[in-house]
Amino acid sequence: MHLRFLVRLLALLVLAAVPLAPAAAKPAPVWAFEKSDLAPDPAFRFGRLPNGMRYVIRHNASPKATAEVRLQIDTGSLDERDSERGFAHFVEHMAFNGSTHVPEGEMVKLLERAGLAFGADTNAQTSFEHTLYMLSLPRNEPALLDTALMLMRETASELTFAPEAVERERGVVLSELRDGQGYALENNKDQLAFLYPAAHFRDRLPIGTAESLKAATSAALKAFWAREYVPAKTTLIVVGDFDADAVEAAIRARFADWPARKPARRPGQGRVLFDQQGAARIHLDPALSERVTVSRHGRWRREPDTAESRRVGLLRQLGYGVINRRMQRLSRLAQPPFRGAGVGTSEVFHIGRTTNLVVDTADKGWRDGLFAAAQVYREALAKGFSEAEVAEQIAGVRTGLENAAAAADTRSNDALVGAVIQLLRDEKVPTTPASALERFNRHAASLTPAAVLAALRADALPLRNPLIRFQGRTAPAKDAKAGAQALRATWNEALRAPLRLKVSAPSGTFAYTDFGAPGTIASDVTRADLGLRQIRFANGVRLNLKRTDLEADRVLVRIYLDGGELLDTKANPTATEMTSMLPTGGLGKHSLDDLQTLLAGRSVSSSISSSGDAFTLGAGTTRRDLELQLQLLAALITDPGWRTEADELYHQTMTNFFARLTATPSSALSNTLPSVISGGDPRFTVQPPETYQALTMARLKADIGDRLARGAIELTLVGDFDPDAAVAMAARTFGALPAREAEFRPYEAERQRSFTPKRGLTVIRHKGEANQAIVRYVWPTTDDSDPVTAMGLELLQEVAGIEVLDVVREALGKAYSPATSSSLSRVWRGWGTFTVNASVDVADVAATRTAIETTIAGLAAAPVDSDILARARAPMRERIDNLLKTNAGWLALTERAASQPERLERYFKARQRLDALTAADLQALARRYLAPDQAVVALVLPEGAPAPDK
């Protein structure tokens, strides 16, 4: 102790004698947690090389024998100078296009041979402040890790920027810029210009501008990369099933000789105008739904991540949560004042912060919506919150923390990488879930309504004389000036008017805990090869159980109920259209809003969709809440509320749907092509708007009520549960229901679907940007009944995808993400499609068509190249091998184990069938199904653009 004091004293004397030394005597923290009282999770290993590059390593075996590798460069579009707009993103593209040791075009091939699919396992992204390179390793082989690290080092310090490679990639980047244009981007740009006129970031969208991208030279891009890609701005992350010591040694061996360089300073970021007030803006577009945003700005506050700042942040979170919950209650009334509303305060990089009140309304409903939302906001800040409201929010927070702590040991690689990314970008310390729960419990008693209100008042910027922005299809008044005055007058009136909006919270308890006498078991067998237990209850309900230890305390629930889209007929094609709205109508004894309060703090949810030959219900829950989850889903099937609140929300949603029907090329295509290729079959055709406005919960009840009451049910549980306890829970819920049909109906007549006899060109028009087009080829194939053919077409899809990507993207530079797809139906007899798609410039339609037709014809003309075949097959092998390393994979395999047992056998033989396929097999499939004259060729063109004759 005395020695420590002496050392400190000597240090002080040295500092006093050398006044210029302090800056060098105390180095800046390397990691955010070094200036926090929060301890990082000790399972993470943090390090820094002498050159300044940082790294984070963590051993983790979820999923087993896999890993995630990330390279983050602290450089984004905010680091660009005026002549460099889009350069950070352009450089990201060039990382895949040639380096010292990997020639142009070889990086993706190298990874594909190793089993990494381009896009799914190999990707990158650029934001305002960062560039992130991502590799998902399907195996934990040291050689594969070495390859990943080698490629990351190539990206960091060895890119070549060959002029011809830059020129080829320029077309790809420009196509990505083109594809992103449209009403949504223009609306976003207008909002940024209004709210932040003096800020730099509004002119630094990562995609850049056409002018700067066209002007980018090899030398200019290389100069940007050399300036920004330096060790001090770089962090490497490796999380997965590798020995941490071995990973650290590999990182040092690969990156230690990267020369250190001084990082460039980021240019000035402009300003947020704290005194900006009293202005209004109106932005109109036929595709925009109505929204009013009320805003005020304030100064940015430096708040390091500490235990105290998290406590204060939690208080703020609770306050905003209560206000937004009040608004949610109003949005669920039979005649709501708005579709949705919310309030929050967020940072604007490091130059300011903004409080926004956002109100979404039906067309021409802005006045009532703005008035109501303003009153909710006023009342909260003036009068505070009730104990019950705060308790409801606390319950949700507590449960989230408890669930995280329970599942801590089996967090996925992706989740752990996400925690590291938060540390790097937001300086949020990656603490253990257990410590987060402990801190919450320590502070829980202090989370009072008064404390919540005080924290909220200190954080939210007063919305006095605010900025008001309107977006929508119809102006709020006859001209801009009158519209601005109307918006301001409504806001001011809402601030003066007496507070009169009251929505009471429910009382009582969840009413669906008794479904009758528990069901008896008619049969109970276990497949030893899968550890899959299969039970049939006496009432006909079937239960599949697969217990795993892959995700601690997590249980996935899936229910298939007979019916689905097969209830849609040519005479009644929208019979199941509103199915997904069923939970919005609540239950017979509880509204949806009541359920949210009654079940606060419980890990349960409900959803239902009409999918293929069944209605599908799904949820994720915990061991503790498994029975409640089953009760909730059983109640949704046996006693849905059918409330008219769901009608109102659905009709508003469909109004917006039709406003955007052809607003972009992709929406025009997706809403038109199914009808085209199905010969105008009403079941696959968008009906007139009035058809959807006539749909109601009452009509849905008439159309699907019988299936809910009597249809066959298959229930599957996958995850961490006690099997016998789970069987008893199922017996008390689904097993206790009245007798169901024992089997799923065959629906033979309803399964008929015919591909249009009209082949060749069809033109679809869109109302988007004048230079945007889509080229899509669709060939009819077959259904999914033959596993060998299905596997062959899937492999052919991968081969064609590589070929099309190489030609349309890499060689021609015409499209950002050309794609192929083989889709074989398990529902419609004989129905399947093989699709090639590319989003291109209108001027490039003809060249793209030629490239696609030539590529597909080549697949039929000759056996595929052996290297391309290997690159296509390897990622498929990895997907098969890794399927059962997650609960989601087990669920996909077992969810129809009783009604479609052939799926299990197909899985066991999948790898063998894949490996047996030859180049000649694929050539035969291409000849059989991909004949040039058998395709429907859909061209999606702007309105008014000339179309080819054929």
Q: What are these regions, as identified by a protein language model?
A:
Residues 1-5:
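N-terminal secretory signal peptides that target proteins for export/translocation
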Residues 56-58, 63-82, 86-88, 105-154, ...:
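M16 family metallopeptidases and their MPP-like homologs
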Residues 94-102:
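Metal-associated gating/positioning segment near the N- to mid-region
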Residues 212-252, 692-731:
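Internal metal/ion-chelating core segments
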